[in-house]
Amino acid sequence: MFLAKSIVCLALLAVANAQFNTNYASGRSGMVHLFEWKWDDIAAECENFLGPYGYAGVQVSPVNENAVKDSRPWWERYQPISYKLVTRSGNEEQFASMVRRCNNVGVRIYVDVVFNHMAANGGTYGTGGSTASPSSKSYPGVPFSSLDFNPTCAISNYNDANQVRNCELVGLRDLNQGNSYVQEKIVEFLNHLIDLGVAGFRVDAAKHMWPADLGVIYGSLKNLNTDHGFESGAKAYIVQEVIDMGGEAISKSEYTGLGAITEFRHSDSIGKAFRGKNQLQYLVNWGVSWGFAASDRSLVFVDNHDNQRGHGAGGADVLTYKVPKQYKMASAFMLAHPFGTPRVMSSFSFTDTDQGPPTTDGQNIASPSFNSDNSCSGGWVCEHRWKQIYNMVGFRNAVGSDAIQNWWDNGSNQIAFSRGSKGFVAFNNDNYDLNSSVQTGLPAGTYCDVISGSKSGSSCTGKTVTVGSDGRANISIGSSEDDGVLAIHVNAKL
């Protein structure tokens, strides 16, 4: 009997453990959130940029039909009308083609899935032509009726876990995930995406759903589609949106047994450090001692689509593309450090926090335009195409799983460390120059700094660093330089 129970427990553990595997193709790391991009444009980006530059995956905006709202704000994508795959980003055929094309070049697709709720009042018409009556909780495109929802009540007290999970988030009709029919429709939706070749999901508003109900849903998912290059038996990577800054009734620890979580404390803490509110020397023990979830349970980011707008967690300390020098430094630190699964934000520029993506006519999303230096125009920021960020994805791929060694700091805001003997990075966030002889851990030779430039044949378009036979190098980062970071690795040796 004990043996039988042990086997069952081990089987359940195996299922759970698989949800933390990113399913990345070998030798790749780093996910990018191509926020509000169209499917055809993402497919081309996988082939032309993400694949060649070593990115491992793309988080895409919600794929299912959403309510059409006046002035087309970004958040209409988070107001589901049905689970039909028709949005401003494209239809099911375009989505399926994108997933295939991205998988073919080693770039995985992760879908932002919204199944905590359906559209709020006023969301009567969808992007796929479906109609709904949110006031009577009728969504015939699924179909859902009032029987499938929790009673109407508003969330006003985040110290009441029952209210947070059973009431409505800003008027969004709250589905009852404990209802077997609701579970069935959600699983049907997710399994359809798995059939189409996705590698995993970001689960929106996970803290507003009961962990036990999510466990039933996740446990009902198919294995990933081997026709798309996934290993037999591979399970979807699940990252749950759980904002836990402490002091609330709901804790991320309730969810980390089911999958990874969005580690908002990482965003808050890295913002404080690179904004100068916390000295960089204290990053020496970056990780769980900062209150983060375990490394394989943490999706980490500098900013996300919510908190760059002041929504969610982090407030004024969150770094965004609007503070480019510090943003690039924080992104470089995240990508250089082994902690967590990093996600790079790729934004559109905005002045109004409700503003939707660039359009051609006020309705249809515009494609990004690309400049000769790889940057974007046409209202798209494309942080993932900034040299200081995409070259650090290359750094992360070059250093692999090598541990942090050779930590150095000046007792203030100048720090450096190596990743084993494969990579070295240094930062200067002080208001005076960094000029020091530092142990890099790297083999002797001349290296190209991948922040200021790129290796091109046997030359470098930026700074070079000469490492001596003892592994030391003279590191120089002026306080007035455009970039407060320098990075070298074995694949950038000249």
Curated annotation (Swiss-Prot):
In the record's cofactor note, how is the cofactor described as bound?
Binds 1 Ca(2+) ion per subunit. Binds 1 Cl(-) ion per subunit.
A Gene Ontology molecular function term of the record? metal ion binding
Q: Which reaction is recorded as catalysed by this protein?
A: Endohydrolysis of (1->4)-alpha-D-glucosidic linkages in polysaccharides containing three or more (1->4)-alpha-linked D-glucose units
Q: Where is this site: Transition state stabilizer?
A: D306
Active site residues according to the UniProt entry: D204, E241
Instruction: Give the intrachain disulfide bonds.
Output: C46-C102, C153-C167, C376-C382, C448-C460
Top-rank taxon of the source lineage equals: Eukaryota
Q: Which GO terms describe its biological process?
A: carbohydrate metabolic process
Q: Which UniProt keywords apply?
A: Calcium, Carbohydrate metabolism, Chloride, Disulfide bond, Glycosidase, Hydrolase, Metal-binding, Signal
Q: How does it assemble?
A: Monomer.
- Family, as annotated: Belongs to the glycosyl hydrolase 13 family.
Designated name of the protein: Alpha-amylase 1
Species assigned in the record? Drosophila ananassae (Fruit fly)
What does the organism's lineage look like at the top? Eukaryota, Metazoa, Ecdysozoa, Arthropoda, Hexapoda
